[in-house]
Every structure is written in structure tokens, then in C-alpha cells.
């Protein structure tokens, strides 16, 4: 048997952790038979090396402002080409709504690599849908990870025929999850008091109001421990939590492993949350985030209509409070948990891993003139879109020294990623030649 093939996963930084979580779940399933590498624009990539032993690199998104928009696709191209050359990768998998032109250019530069788009369904009908035919045609394969709410998908991807559909993908796997006692010990929770996990975003005014409304619905639950993954505060540091709650902010990755610690959950209706919490049979209230391309309301309606979760009206703060309050009823919690036991196991990670292994063994394809033309079209469409939309990004950094690191420590990586400096990460164990190339890339796009 030959050496295990390298498969690169590249993910965008969406709302939530769905893209990175899917890539990680598939990479875990691949690990016995392949060498997965994850490059991600999500800051949570800092957690992956120490949690799973998977090689990872942070890839700054265009919104960081570390180089101009016109150069960013070329920077992505050169980063991915260098990684392909270092690892002799056979497949490049992109998980995100928009397959950026830089990834397509990298495959065009290294045509021996097969390009796969991991394209989640349930798109909202927004302007991005018009690029779907062009984007899909630039791929060697399109794989659609299954969604419990697939029957309610009436978006633009639901009409397309090129995708290979699989079972849902999730970091939650029953065989790997800790039991209730172990989970509570790992999180430092009281073994005898009820606990609720609240995973809602904050930042924008409407998101802050939803957080407060949800927390208000937990008031009156005797001896309750309210568990959050970040402090419930607004941009000015003001608490969003009403008085009378025992709040505990935890840091644990992956949370999918310790969901048995909780009696109920309140979360956004993203792909990741639904396919972890419901797969774990956790009684859940869903509060949709309507930003972005993910049709969270369609997913929430399906879960509610068939009795798998409670859907709060995200536009009605009083309804959010009252719906969350229903979780205080033990009969309601028992009913939701019992119903979730009917859901199929999220085994899509293993399915996709097996498909990628077969793709890795396929002979290289020739990159056609039409594919190269599609790359140019997508690149200039993206630049024009950003100029028209004037999407907010951080102010460009022109004179800050670049920080290089090969650390796999989650705290160190997280600090560097969140800092105001340009941060270039090498995966641990990379060669001196690769590091020299990466320095050259940084000099080219950031300046010396």
C-alpha cells in the first residue's frame, strides 16, 4: 500500500462555525487513511491542532485588510500552491458559500489536484445565487452535506443537479461523547443542578436583544446553571444578562463531546448547532440568525413542525422569552428528547471521507480553457462586488511586522489570530523550504 494521500480542506469564515466544524468532522474520519490538512479563515481553527492532532493553518480573510482586495485572491493562490507543493496534496476541498477565485487559481496552477466544493444547501435567495452556475462549473466535484431539514430547502441549490448528497455531517458522534457525569466534571458544573447551554451570537443590537430575551426565559428555573461560551456583554462591556441567573462562561472544544452535561439548549439555527444538539437528543429552542446565506428560518421551521425542537420567532422578543420558558417544563423536554431519538445518526463525515479517498485515486484532469476563463470571471466579479457593496473590513495594516509561528497551542494561536498584527502560521513539522516560500509570499503581498 502506498503513502496516505494528503487532502487539504479550506474553509471560509461564515456566521458561526459550520464550515470549520464540517471540515474537521470529515478530516477526523479521513485520518486513518489519509493526511488531512485544514486551512481556515475562522479564528476557531486555533483549537483544532491540540484538540484533534490535525495539521492546520490560519488563512486571513479579505476582511482582515492585511492586503488589498485586488491582491488577496493572488495571495490565497500562492498560499494554497505552496501548501500543495509541500504536502503533495491530491485533493483540495473548499467549504464555504463563495469559492473564492484564489482557490480555483491554485488548482489551475496545480492541475493534478482535484477541486471539490463542499456546498451546504438551504441557501437564501440572495444575489450570490446568480454566480452558482459559474462557480459549480469550475469544480471537479460538488458535494452537499445532508441536512435534517432538506425537505424544506427551496433555495437556489435545491434545483441544481451536480451535487453528490450525503448524510448530515457533525462533530457529535455518540460513541465518542462523554456521559453526563464525565461531561459535567470536564466543564466544572455541579452534578446535581440543572444546566442549560446558550449559544447565541452578540454584537449587533438585534443579536444583543435576542440574547437578553432568551436569558429572561430561564429566570425562575430552580437552581439552574446557565452556561455560555462567551461573556454576554455588548460592545461597551455592559451585561446583557438579566439579574437572578447563575451564569458560567466556559471554554471547551469540541462542545459536541460534552452535550450530555445539559438539560436543554438555546442556540441559533445554523447547520452546526442543529446537527450537534439535536443529534445528541438535547431539548432545544432555536433562535434563527437571518444574516448570511444560510436559510436558518427554513431549518427552524422544519425542526419545529416535526417536533424535534421549539422555534422561537426571531423577530419577536417576547416570543423568544416565552418559547425559552417552555424548556422549564420537564414534560416538554422529555418530548423533544424522545422525538430527536428518531433522527438518523449524522454519519456524513465518514461518507464524504470515503468519497474523497476515491477522488484522490483518480487520474489528474486537464484544466480547460473554459475553466481558466471561469476563474478570471469569478475573480473580477468578486472584486466588483466588494467595490459596489463596500463591505466593511479592518483598516489596512501597512507597516506592522509579520509574525510567523508553527505553534500548535490553542491559546497562543488564538492570541495571534485575534491580534492586530499580520500573522502567518506554518503547520507544525513543515519543511525549511516551505517556510522560506511562505516568507517570500509574505514579502510579496505585505511588503518588507
Could you say what each language-model-derived stretch is?
Residues 10-22, 205-207:
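A short, glycine/small-residue-rich beta-strand->loop->alpha-helix junction that serves as a flexible
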Residues 328-404, 410, 420-422, 426, ...:
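C-terminal amphipathic helix plus adjacent low-complexity
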Residues 181-264:
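Donor-nucleotide binding loops and adjacent catalytic segments primarily
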Residues 3-15, 29-79:
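Conserved nucleotide-sugar phosphate-binding/catalytic loop shared by glycosyltransferases and other
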Residues 81-99:
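Short N-terminal targeting/anchoring amphipathic segment
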Residues 120, 124-127, 135-202:
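A nucleotide-sugar donor-handling region in carbohydrate enzymes
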Residues 260-273, 282:
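Acidic donor-binding loop of glycosyltransferase active sites
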Residues 273-321:
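Catalytic binding pocket for nucleotide-activated donors in carbohydrate/polymer assembly enzymes
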Amino acid at each position: 500500500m502506498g503513502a496516505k494521500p494528503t487532502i487539504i480542506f479550506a474553509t471560509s469564515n461564515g456566521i458561526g462555525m459550520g464550515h470549520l466544524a464540517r471540515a474537521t468532522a470529515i478530516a477526523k474520519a479521513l485520518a486513518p487513511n489519509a493526511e488531512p490538512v485544514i486551512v481556515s479563515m475562522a479564528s476557531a481553527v486555533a483549537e483544532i491542532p491540540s484538540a484533534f492532532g490535525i495539521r492546520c493553518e490560519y488563512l486571513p480573510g479579505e476582511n482582515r485588510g492585511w492586503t488589498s482586495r485586488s491582491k488577496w485572491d493572488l495571495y490565497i493562490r500562492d498560499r494554497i500552491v505552496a501548501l500543495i507543493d509541500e504536502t503533495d496534496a491530491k485533493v483540495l476541498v473548499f467549504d464555504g458559500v463563495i469559492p473564492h477565485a484564489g482557490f480555483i487559481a491554485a488548482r489551475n496552477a496545480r492541475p493534478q489536484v482535484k477541486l471539490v466544493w463542499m456546498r451546504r444547501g438551504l441557501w437564501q435567495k440572495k444575489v450570490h445565487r446568480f454566480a452558482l452556475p459559474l462557480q459549480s462549473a469550475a469544480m471537479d466535484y460538488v458535494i452537499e452535506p445532508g441536512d435534517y431539514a432538506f425537505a424544506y430547502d427551496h433555495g437556489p441549490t435545491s434545483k441544481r443537479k451536480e451535487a453528490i448528497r450525503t448524510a448530515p455531517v457533525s462533530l457529535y458522534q455518540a460513541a465518542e461523547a462523554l456521559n453526563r457525569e464525565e461531561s459535567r466534571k470536564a466543564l466544572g458544573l455541579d452534578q446535581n443542578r440543572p444546566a442549560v447551554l446558550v449559544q447565541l451570537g452578540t454584537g449587533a443590537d438585534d443579536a444583543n436583544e435576542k440574547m437578553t430575551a432568551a436569558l429572561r426565559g430561564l429566570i425562575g428555573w430552580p437552581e439552574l446553571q446557565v452556561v455560555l461560551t462567551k461573556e454576554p456583554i455588548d460592545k461597551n462591556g455592559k451585561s446583557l444578562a438579566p439579574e437572578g441567573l447563575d451564569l458560567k462562561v466556559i471554554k471547551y472544544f469540541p462542545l459536541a463531546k460534552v452535550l450530555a452535561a445539559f438539560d436543554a439548549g438555546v442556540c441559533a439555527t445554523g447547520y452546526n448547532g442543529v446537527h450537534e444538539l439535536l443529534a445528541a437528543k438535547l431539548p432545544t429552542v432555536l433562535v434563527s440568525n437571518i444574516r448570511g446565506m444560510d436559510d436558518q428560518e427554513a431549518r427552524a421551521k422544519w425542526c419545529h413542525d416535526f417536533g424535534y425542537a421549539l422555534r422561537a420567532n426571531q423577530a419577536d422578543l417576547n416570543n423568544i422569552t416565552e418559547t425559552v420558558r417552555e424548556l422549564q417544563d420537564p414534560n416538554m423536554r422529555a418530548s423533544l428528547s424522545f422525538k430527536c431519538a428518531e433522527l438518523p445518526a449524522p454519519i456524513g463525515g465518514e461518507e464524504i471521507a470515503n468519497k474523497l479517498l476515491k477522488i484522490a485515486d483518480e487520474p489528474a484532469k486537464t484544466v480547460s480553457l473554459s475553466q481558466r476563463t471561469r476563474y478570471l470571471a469569478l475573480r473580477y466579479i468578486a472584486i466588483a462586488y466588494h467595490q459596489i457593496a463596500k463591505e466593511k473590513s479592518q483598516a489596512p495594516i501597512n507597516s506592522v511586522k509579520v509574525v510567523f509561528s508553527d505553534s500548535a497551542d490553542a491559546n497562543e494561536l488564538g492570541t495571534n489570530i485575534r491580534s492586530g498584527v499580520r500573522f502567518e502560521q506554518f503547520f507544525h513539522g513543515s519543511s525549511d523550504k516551505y517556510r522560506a516560500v511562505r516568507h517570500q509570499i509574505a514579502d510579496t503581498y505585505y511588503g518588507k
